[in-house]
Amino acid sequence: MASGILLNVKEEVTCPICLELLTEPLSLPCGHSFCQACITANHKESMLYKEEERSCPVCRISYQPENIQPNRHVANIVEKLREVKLSPEEGQKVDHCARHGEKLLLFCQEDSKVICWLCERSQEHRGHHTFLMEEVAQEYHVKLQTALEMLRQKQQEAEKLEADIREEKASWKIQIDYDKTNVSADFEQLREILDWEESNELQNLEKEEEDILKSLTKSETEMVQQTQYMRELISDLEHRLQGSMMELLQGVDGIIKRVENMTLKKPKTFHKNQRRVFRAPDLKGMLDMFRELTDVRRYWVDVTLAPNNISHAVIAEDKRQVSYQNPQIMYQAPGSSFGSLTNFNYCTGVLGSQSITSRKLTNFNYCTGVLGSQSITSGKHYWEVDVSKKSAWILGVCAGFQPDATYNIEQNENYQPKYGYWVIGLQEGDKYSVFQDSSSHTPFAPFIVPLSVIICPDRVGVFVDYEACTVSFFNITNHGFLIYKFSQCSFSKPVFPYLNPRKCTVPMTLCSPSS
């Protein structure tokens, strides 16, 4: 109720020109009041249009400027009214214009704001399109709802983009950290390679220096002796020529024969163009080998040897080591001497605890192969064998088999893929070979192909990819250099690791994954 009275009072003290509360109010003789600035501006406008009489902007009654009087009473009311504010509770009941105190019932489309009827008539909104709030509220409610849904959709997209960029950021950090680790590891490997190559090359040069200088020193000594001998001979001849006739002829034939028969011994020389030229190692190739070896080593399995009853293939208690023991020491056929065993044939293969033994004791050819106890029927498998200091060995994989009455055991010594053997070997200390299927030239024996091995391996890695049907051999001593790879292997049955120490008593050892 009080707010209604205040609003009515406010209407009475509002300037009809600016529609604001009166400022320094002046009253005309007709009783209407105006702001001093507003009525002065109206007076100047009349002078501009050369109007002889001034009239009230509201009632158009003429007045003279000297009749305008300050309205102190209205000024006091305005001052008090400016100090009065509606209570919060009353303000919540009715929305009123902050400028005019009128109800906010209209909407200005151009300015997109709610106004009162006095605002609509003011200079600020003159000529604008205005509507009752009820007329446009539903339309704008729909628009705002559509905008809200669109914004929520964009918010979801923004959140997804934010999550994606965070995920990408994390992925990049992981990848870069991984690459940094790999780079450090690769360069560490390169440093190891360079250190090893440098040490090896320096050792070769030192050996070359030792051998050549030793030979040249020997030649130098011989040349010194030869020169000294010639000096002595020349001195003898000069003495004879300068001496008496008796000295000249005494033993003259002997000394002439010594001169005529003397052959000048030439020293042994070494041509520099025949020297081995040092070439920097192929670091990229070595690094690729390292990476391949690192990859296959992820499939390292702990292989042990199957128990067997082969007396000359001795397996250690830990089932990791097999060595050859001369059967002449352990076996003597009834009525025979050890010497008569040299032509016996004794060939044995082992699968688990089962052994296959040829009873034919003629043309004695020792076959001491043993199998690992773990069968391979799928997947990828890798293991390493220590063959250091051995002068002969055979290793690889062998297909499991069960002998029958028709099985020709002599074929067991034919290390051929068609018989289930994918193996490589060493003989005579430095001759490496791969055993292939027999050819027309060797119909009953494996076709042995020499392998070029620059650095003799102390340890050999074996990798079997059952699904890819491949068996690969790596020279661990030479940075994982690939020695040989069998492709298109016909794995029709389980295969087993195969080790044969041959006639070398130095053991072969299966390395543990932690070694």
Curated annotation (Swiss-Prot):
Residues 187-200 are annotated as: Required for interaction with GABARAP and for autophagy. The modification N-acetylalanine is found at A2. A zinc finger (B box-type) spans 92-133. The modification Phosphoserine is found at S87. It catalyses: S-ubiquitinyl-[E2 ubiquitin-conjugating enzyme]-L-cysteine + [acceptor protein]-L-lysine = [E2 ubiquitin-conjugating enzyme]-L-cysteine + N(6)-ubiquitinyl-[acceptor protein]-L-lysine. It is an enzyme of class 2 (transferase). SMART domains: BBOX, RING, SPRY. Keywords: Acetylation, Antiviral defense, Autophagy, Coiled coil, Cytoplasm, Immunity, Innate immunity, Metal-binding, Nucleus, Phosphoprotein, Transferase, Ubl conjugation, Ubl conjugation pathway, Zinc, Zinc-finger. Degraded in a proteasome-independent fashion in the absence of viral infection but in a proteasome-dependent fashion following exposure to restriction sensitive virus. Autoubiquitinated in a RING finger- and UBE2D2-dependent manner. Monoubiquitinated by TRIM21. Deubiquitinated by Yersinia YopJ. Ubiquitination may not lead to proteasomal degradation. GO terms for molecular function: pattern recognition receptor activity; ubiquitin-protein transferase activity; zinc ion binding. GO terms for biological process: activation of innate immune response; autophagy; defense response to virus; innate immune response; positive regulation of canonical NF-kappaB signal transduction; positive regulation of MAPK cascade; positive regulation of NF-kappaB transcription factor activity; protein K63-linked ubiquitination. Pathway: Protein modification; protein ubiquitination. It is found in: Cytoplasm; Nucleus. Residues 137-225 form a coiled coil. Its EC number is 2.3.2.27. Residues 283-515 form the B30.2/SPRY domain. A zinc finger (RING-type) spans 15-60. Its main location: cytoplasm. It comes from the Eukaryota. GO terms for cellular component: nucleus; P-body. Zn(2+) binds at C97, H100, C119, H125. Belongs to the TRIM/RBCC family. Can form homodimers and homotrimers. In addition to lower-order dimerization, also exhibits a higher-order multimerization and both low- and high-order multimerizations are essential for its restriction activity. Interacts with BTBD1 and BTBD2. Interacts with PSMC4, PSMC5, PSMD7 and HSPA8/HSC70. Interacts (via B30.2/SPRY domain) with HSPA1A/B. Interacts with PSMC2, MAP3K7/TAK1, TAB2 and TAB3. Interacts with SQSTM1. Interacts with TRIM6 and TRIM34. Interacts with ULK1 (phosphorylated form), GABARAP, GABARAPL1, GABARAPL2, MAP1LC3A, MAP1LC3C and BECN1. The B box-type zinc finger domain and the coiled-coil domain contribute to the higher and low order multimerization respectively which is essential for restriction activity. The coiled coil domain is important for higher order multimerization by promoting the initial dimerization. The B30.2/SPRY domain acts as a capsid recognition domain. Polymorphisms in this domain explain the observed species-specific differences among orthologs. This is Tripartite motif-containing protein 5. The gene is TRIM5.
